[in-house]
Amino acid sequence: MSKVHNSEYIKELVVDNTSYKIYDINKAASDIGLPLKKLPYSLRVLLENVLRTNGNKENLLVFKEWLKTKKSNTEIDFMPARVLMQDFTGVPAIVDLAAMRDAMQKIGCNPLKINPLIPVDLVIDHSVSVDSYGNKESFDQNVHMEMKRNIERYQFLKWGQQAFNNFKVVPPGTGICHQVNLEFLSQVVWHNDGTAYPDSLVGTDSHTTMVNGLSVLGWGVGGIEAESAMLGQPITMIIPEVIGVKLIGKLAGMATATDLVLTITEILRRKKVVGKFVEFFGNGLRNLTISDRATISNMSPEYGATCGFFPIDQETLKYLEVTGREITQIKLVEKYAIEQNLWYNCEDTQEYTEVLELDLSTVYSSLAGPKRPQDRVNLNCVASNFQNELPYFALANKDIDKKYAVANQNYAIGNGDVVIAAITSCTNTSNPSVMIGAALLAKKALEHGLNVKPWVKTSLAPGSKVVTEYLKLSGLDKYLDALGFNLVGYGCTTCIGNSGSLNPEIENTINKNRLVVASVLSGNRNFEGRINPLTKASYLASPILVVAYALSGTLNIDLTNTPIGANIYLKDIWPSQKEIDEVIANSINSSMFIEKYADVFNGTKEWRDLQITTGTNYNWDKNSTYINNPPYFDNIGSEHSIKDIKSARILAIFGDSITTDHISPAGSISKNSPAAKYLIKHHIEPLDFNSYGSRRGNHEVMMRGTFANIRIKNEMCNGVEGGFTINQLSGVQQTIYDTAMDYKAHDIPLVIFAGKEYGSGSSRDWAAKGPGLLGIKAVIAESFERIHRSNLVGMGILPLTFTGKNTRLNLKLDGSEIIDLIGLSENIKPYNLVKCVIKKQTNEISTIDLILQIFTENEINYIKHGSIMQFVVESLKG
């Protein structure tokens, strides 16, 4: 098929006397016999992207072929309009770019070739912790501590802002990247050099998907994949299956958007939508605001989908107007969407791989927990759910009734008591309905004489300054303050594990009595050990229920039938939707968005006063424990090939649902960990360890932190929690890091075995970089989460899955086996079968087939070059 120059599909679109070029997908579809209105809206956006960036008729025909079977095995190149980053993943990405510049210089090439070709926005939101809480000074104190801890990282980011084109930093204390993206950065229709096209992006955070609620196609990728995208490399992908979710009816009773997303997460996780697009349609859309939709799209990683997409409609325009977008931009969005058949039409006949239906009126008030976001629990069943789960917590006190006195306090705590109640996360703080609802419930609680229990650590950390502005304007902020939900920061805080310490007396009581206490938060993840090392149980809930559980102080009562106070029930203080809507109508306007985002890139005086060095290449400080030149390019220019893996050892065997939190924790650094020993050796006191997430710019810390989660369970070490394994060279139980270094010294390759959903959770590429630096060559699992699989490939690690009924369990592996992986040397292709030879200590040898989970020829190239970063440098050197 001949190449068709895509200029034949350019047409003019005039909006308010301004002329734009657009790429006409109606004409392109007609030319290849593609019935455009049968294509899901999300795929129409992809079709335009392919048409505009590569007018190859074969690529366009892929969409026509997709309609026949509603799936595809053909890859396309996706070129996002921009990249979004947060600081935990953004710092290592900029470290990589700085290292790439050094690598280019090393091989005699122009280092300035390493420069973003598309807009990149980095929002600093992951570094603030809840050190101070429950008072009016908490925000200032936490911001001060954040700047003090992270000054070196922030200086590095400011260097990056002057060193790289198209790179902007939103300073700390401003907001959460996804809420800033939703309220300010996103355009829905982008325009550049006179051409208009759908806004799209990839982001280095898995919850980048939130923006699909605003009809902007985007998803999370690892930092290394984002780096290649900003340097002009396409995101290669197979056109995904698209699951249509038909929403009908309207939320009723006490149900909120949070309850809806927890319900959707439960349904879709069970449906197994990993690697698929989800698209929402139906008459229920008219009853969901953009804020509601954004809540649903935000949790796409939790239900496993690549994205949860909502098409453009009147709600999109209303949201753009209320958030202060220019009227000319809003008109462009409307006219472009209608012209290109991207405007939602309930009479369209779009076809999906599969269709599910959900009646919104059936959604019930819910929480999710205690360990996974897909484990939804009806509000009236939370107490029984926790009590049923209690026996399954390792090393826990199982007595549900006994209370233990807290030293120097006049109260006692026990299993199931709530010690953290956090209104946190862009998932919910971007939604005025649940935020106003929480404030109204606080008001009514105080009017009924209720108060927060003294053992509960409370906090409010919204995703943008607009939230505190409308709470203040409505007069409701004082009620949240009175209950201890004072502003602690504009950032991710508790949702990502930056919950800060508990009262020392409470911590001692928990540890001494092995209590399973709980956190209740309005976040999106609750994996064990994530929120706080001492809260083994964590439940996700709406901000309204977060306040309710702070009042009750325990999970062990049914809030639907048991009074919170003296004859006061939850239903007595629950705000009606009418009350909430009235406050929203009187308190939220476009001027507050315009005002709060006018200086979004300026930051505080402390930020502006940061002194930095300038220059094209970064001046590395060898003594730094935050920013270090990584070793990824030490062998740049060497020959590239893929070889069979011989005589590998098993470093660890893991069960199901091993998350990227388990693999590369983001939270506190344990005082007895290999990372702690490294920091102490470099004269860093425990008080100044900061977190793993903050030290992702230093590979020495991060490789030591790999598999160092205190709750991870390696099946090679029965009954032991934490990052330990058996060193087969000595037979001794050691840390995973020390064992890996011993194997590396003996030039022994390593593999990991695991169960289902390996690598679920955050997009963090350190969950692939760390294993790569430990010497892991392959991960063999029952299934992989989408982003993590890509990250493994991007770091040159082979993702392999079992065939048939084989699993780590029925193979009866104990970790002493020697592994050969055969079939990698010659003409390797996506989805190849690989022979796995397992040699047991008894000299018994068995051979099984594995499937190579590499999807595209580009991914084969990444493996051949050792990593996507080396591939990019090699591609640019010419």
UniProtKB/Swiss-Prot annotation:
UniProt KW keywords: 4Fe-4S, Iron, Iron-sulfur, Lyase, Metal-binding, RNA-binding, Tricarboxylic acid cycle
Reaction(s) this enzyme catalyzes, per UniProt: citrate = D-threo-isocitrate; (2S,3R)-3-hydroxybutane-1,2,3-tricarboxylate = 2-methyl-cis-aconitate + H2O
Metabolic or biological pathway, per its Swiss-Prot or TrEMBL entry: Carbohydrate metabolism; tricarboxylic acid cycle; isocitrate from oxaloacetate: step 2/2; Organic acid metabolism; propanoate degradation
Binding residues for [4Fe-4S] cluster: C426, C492, C495
Presence of the UniProt keyword Flavoprotein in the record: no
Necessary cofactors: [4Fe-4S] cluster
Enzyme Commission number, as recorded: 4.2.1.3, 4.2.1.99
SUPFAM superfamilies, alphabetized: Aconitase iron-sulfur domain, LeuD/IlvD-like
GO biological process, one term: propionate metabolic process, methylcitrate cycle
GO molecular function: 2-methylisocitrate dehydratase activity; 4 iron, 4 sulfur cluster binding; aconitate hydratase activity; metal ion binding; mRNA 3'-UTR binding; mRNA binding
InterPro entries in alphabetical order: AcnA_IRP_Swivel, Acnase/IPM_dHydase_lsu_aba_1/3, Acoase/IPM_deHydtase_lsu_aba, Aconitase/3IPM_dehydase_swvl, Aconitase/IRP2, Aconitase_4Fe-4S_BS, Aconitase_4Fe-4S_dom, AconitaseA/IPMdHydase_ssu_swvl
Free-text cofactor note: Binds 1 [4Fe-4S] cluster per subunit.
Family: Belongs to the aconitase/IPM isomerase family.
Assembly and binders: Monomer.
PANTHER family named in the record: ACONITASE/IRON-RESPONSIVE ELEMENT FAMILY MEMBER
Role description: Involved in the catabolism of short chain fatty acids (SCFA) via the tricarboxylic acid (TCA)(acetyl degradation route) and probably the 2-methylcitrate cycle I (propionate degradation route). Catalyzes the reversible isomerization of citrate to isocitrate via cis-aconitate. Could catalyze the hydration of 2-methyl-cis-aconitate to yield (2R,3S)-2-methylisocitrate. The apo form of AcnA functions as a RNA-binding regulatory protein.
Name under which the protein is recorded: Aconitate hydratase A
Lineage per the UniProt record: Bacteria, Pseudomonadati, Pseudomonadota, Alphaproteobacteria, Rickettsiales
Gene that specifies this protein: acnA
